[in-house]
C-alpha cells in the first residue's frame, strides 16, 4: 500500500471533478518516485507581486490542463504509460485478490497514471484529463437482482456504489410510486433460513384417509334368526307408534275437558258479577238511618 503524505502540486496535480471532494483533506497517495528514494521536484515559482500573496506551506496550482480544449487531452490519453500503475487498481488487487467478485463492476474509475504520460515528468504522475463518468444503472425490482447480488453482498464490497430508491406502495390497488425523500432505507434481504424453508403450509397434501370402519357381519336374510329379529323390531315399532297415538288422544281429551271447565267458570263469574251489581243497587236505594241502625246491630 502507498503511504499518505501532504499534497504537493509539483508531483501530483489537483484531481479532476470526480475526485474534488478529496481536496478538503489535502492528502493524496504518495507517487511511485518517492518509493524508490528519489526526491520530488520543487514547487513552481511563486506568483508575481501583483497577485495575492500565499503562505509558506501553500503551493501554486496550474489549471492549464483543464482550460485547454479536449482534443489534445484525448490524444495524450490514447498513449498509456506502462511505467506507472493505477493506485486504485493496485488497491483493489491487494484487497480483493482472494475474493473475486462474481459480477463485474458497472462503474468506470479514472486512472491517474495513464492519462497525459508524455507531458509529465518521468518521476511524477501526469495531470489526467477530465474523464466522463458512467451513469448509474436504473432502478430494478429487488426480487430480480436479489439472487445475483447475494454472493457479492455477502463477500462485502465497500467501494461499490448502489443507488437504492425508496419504493412506496399504496394499499388502494393503484400503482406504486418511487420516493427518495419519504423512505431512505434499502429493501430488505431475505435470510438464508427463510429462503431454504419449504413452504409446507402453502402446498399441504390431501388429508389422511380415516381408518376403515369395522366390516359388518354378513347376515343371511333367508335365515330364521333374521326373520325373528325383523318380527321383534316390527312389533316394537308398532308398540311405540300405538303409545304415541294414545298420548295424543289423551292430550286432546284433556284439552277438551279443560276448555269445558274454563267455559263453566267464565259463566259463573258472569253470574256473580251480575248479582254483585244488583246488591249494590239495592244498598244505594235504602235510606241512611236504616243503614246506620243496621250497622249497630
UniProtKB/Swiss-Prot annotation:
Keywords: Acetylation, Activator, Cytoplasm, Differentiation, DNA-binding, Glycoprotein, Isopeptide bond, Methylation, Nucleus, Phosphoprotein, Transcription, Transcription regulation, Ubl conjugation. Liver and lung. Phosphorylated at Thr-189 by MAPK and CDK2, serves to prime phosphorylation at Thr-180 and Ser-185 by GSK3B and acquire DNA-binding as well as transactivation activities, required to induce adipogenesis. MAPK and CDK2 act sequentially to maintain Thr-189 in the primed phosphorylated state during mitotical cloning expansion and thereby progression of terminal differentiation. Phosphorylation at Ser-105 enhances transactivation activity. Phosphorylation at Ser-277 in response to calcium increases transactivation activity. Phosphorylated at Thr-189 by RPS6KA1. Methylated. Methylation at Arg-3 by CARM1 and at Lys-39 by EHMT2 inhibit transactivation activity. Methylation is probably inhibited by phosphorylation at Thr-189. The lineage of its organism: Eukaryota, Metazoa, Chordata, Craniata, Vertebrata. Residues 1-22 are annotated as: Required for Lys-134 sumoylation. Residues 249-256 are annotated as: Leucine-zipper. It comes from Rattus norvegicus (Rat). The keyword Metal-binding does not apply. The modification N6-methylated lysine is found at residue 39. This is CCAAT/enhancer-binding protein beta. SMART domains: BRLZ. The modification N6-acetyllysine is found at residues 39, 99, 102-103.
Amino acid at each position: 500500500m502507498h503511504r499518505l503524505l501532504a499534497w504537493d502540486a509539483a508531483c501530483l496535480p489537483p484531481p479532476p471533478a470526480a475526485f474534488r471532494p478529496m481536496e478538503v483533506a489535502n492528502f493524496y497517495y504518495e507517487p511511485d518516485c518517492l518509493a524508490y528514494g528519489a526526491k520530488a521536484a520543487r514547487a513552481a515559482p511563486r506568483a508575481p507581486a501583483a497577485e495575492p500573496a500565499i503562505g509558506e506551506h501553500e503551493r501554486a496550482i496550474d489549471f492549464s490542463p483543464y482550460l485547454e480544449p479536449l482534443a489534445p487531452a484525448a490524444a495524450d490519453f490514447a498513449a498509456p504509460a506502462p511505467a506507472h500503475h493505477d493506485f486504485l487498481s493496485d488497491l483493489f488487487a491487494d484487497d480483493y485478490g482472494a475474493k473475486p467478485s462474481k459480477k463485474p463492476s458497472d462503474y468506470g474509475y479514472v486512472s491517474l497514471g495513464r492519462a497525459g504520460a508524455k507531458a509529465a515528468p518521468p518521476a511524477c504522475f501526469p495531470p489526467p484529463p477530465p474523464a466522463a463518468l458512467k451513469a448509474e444503472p436504473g432502478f430494478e425490482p429487488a426480487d430480480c437482482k436479489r439472487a445475483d447480488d447475494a454472493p457479492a453482498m455477502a463477500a462485502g464490497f465497500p467501494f461499490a456504489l448502489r443507488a437504492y430508491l425508496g419504493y412506496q406502495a399504496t394499499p388502494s390497488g393503484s400503482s406504486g410510486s418511487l420516493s427518495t425523500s419519504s423512505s431512505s432505507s434499502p429493501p430488505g434481504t431475505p435470510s438464508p433460513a427463510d429462503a431454504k424453508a419449504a413452504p409446507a403450509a402453502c402446498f399441504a397434501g390431501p388429508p389422511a384417509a380415516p381408518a376403515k370402519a369395522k366390516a359388518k357381519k354378513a347376515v343371511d336374510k333367508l335365515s330364521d334368526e333374521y326373520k325373528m329379529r325383523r318380527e321383534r323390531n316390527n312389533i316394537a315399532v308398532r308398540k311405540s307408534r300405538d303409545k304415541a297415538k294414545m298420548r295424543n288422544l289423551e292430550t286432546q281429551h284433556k284439552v277438551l275437558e279443560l276448555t269445558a271447565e274454563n267455559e263453566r267458570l267464565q259463566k259463573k263469574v258472569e253470574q256473580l258479577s251480575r248479582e254483585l251489581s244488583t246488591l249494590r243497587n239495592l244498598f244505594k236505594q235504602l235510606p241512611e238511618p236504616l243503614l246506620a241502625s243496621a250497622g249497630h246491630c
